[in-house]
């Protein structure tokens, strides 16, 4: 099992972000992850919310080992060609530590406030599936022409190539059984989702497996990821870890606890070594 840390950057300063990233690195965690939202989701909506990919670019120079990604970037937020350039830039600034995690986007209020179009769910899912294909091709190919319903490229080339070859891992986040999970099965290197229990998680994994097989992919090659709350009593945290690990989760995002840093440090020092 690999563990990442949700930085939860809303309402916080750059210095606090650096401190949290250093904590993750010193604890031996695999990665640090930022929200990709332009307004604060929690607390004062007018409070600070550092932009995710710029934040990761800065953290790339403040860290040496942890991997860097968003959880997740909505495909309505940026044209996929722009996102590809941002991911590759962070990959170079970090020496090959970028993760590319995308979703369909969900926060209608944020879109409305900022004047970002928020299409119906069917179109957002179409954009997600087109976007993941465009990203992979721009990471690996020259002279890319793509004719989708919503995304079009004409003889596009982006350089430099990523440090990671063939490309940074592409994550698809979400739990929608009709569209999101099949998209993950067809295209993702990693799927991130959440469930209330092992039975629900097993059902979602089965959908991903089926879509992967139909696309000629080996389902075992798709890493399964989820998130772990550490605000509950430790026996409940251990129980959640056990049933998620039992259903093929291989990466867990540690949610920054509302109780603060001391709770996280207790988990890292006393609980994490006992898991698995």
Residue ranges of model-derived segments:
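Active-site-adjacent structural elements that line small-molecule/cofactor binding pockets in enzymes
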Residues: 1-276
């Amino acid at each position: 099992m690999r563990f990442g840390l949700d930085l939860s950057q809303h309402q916080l300063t750059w210095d606090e972000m650096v401190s949290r990233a250093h904590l993750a690195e010193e604890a031996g965690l695999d990665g640090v992850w930022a929200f990709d939202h332009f307004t604060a989701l929690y607390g004062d909506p007018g409070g600070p919310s550092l932009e995710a990919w710029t934040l990761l670019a800065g953290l790339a120079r403040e860290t040496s080992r942890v991997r860097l990604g968003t959880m997740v970037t909505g495909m309505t937020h940026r044209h996929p060609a722009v996102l590809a350039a941002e991911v590759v830039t962070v990959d170079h600034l970090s020496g090959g530590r970028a993760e590319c995690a995308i979703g369909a986007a969900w926060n209608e209020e944020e879109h409305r406030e900022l004047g970002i179009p928020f299409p119906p769910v069917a179109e957002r899912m179409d954009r997600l599936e087109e976007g993941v294909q465009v990203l992979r091709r721009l990471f690996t190919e020259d002279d890319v022409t793509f004719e989708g319903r919503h995304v079009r490229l004409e003889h596009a080339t982006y350089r430099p190539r990523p440090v990671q070859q063939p490309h940074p891992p592409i994550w698809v986040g979400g739990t929608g059984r009709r569209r999101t999970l099949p998209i993950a099965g067809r295209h993702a290197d990693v799927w991130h989702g959440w469930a209330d229990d092992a039975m629900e998680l097993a059902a979602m994994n089965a959908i991903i497996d089926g879509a992967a097989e139909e696309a000629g992919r080996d389902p075992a090659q798709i890493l399964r990821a989820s998130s772990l709350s550490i605000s509950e009593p430790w026996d409940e945290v251990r129980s959640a870890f056990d049933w998620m690990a039992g259903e093929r989760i291989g990466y867990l995002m540690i949610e920054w606890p509302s109780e603060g840093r001391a709770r996280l440090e207790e988990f890292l020092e006393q609980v994490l070594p006992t898991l698995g």
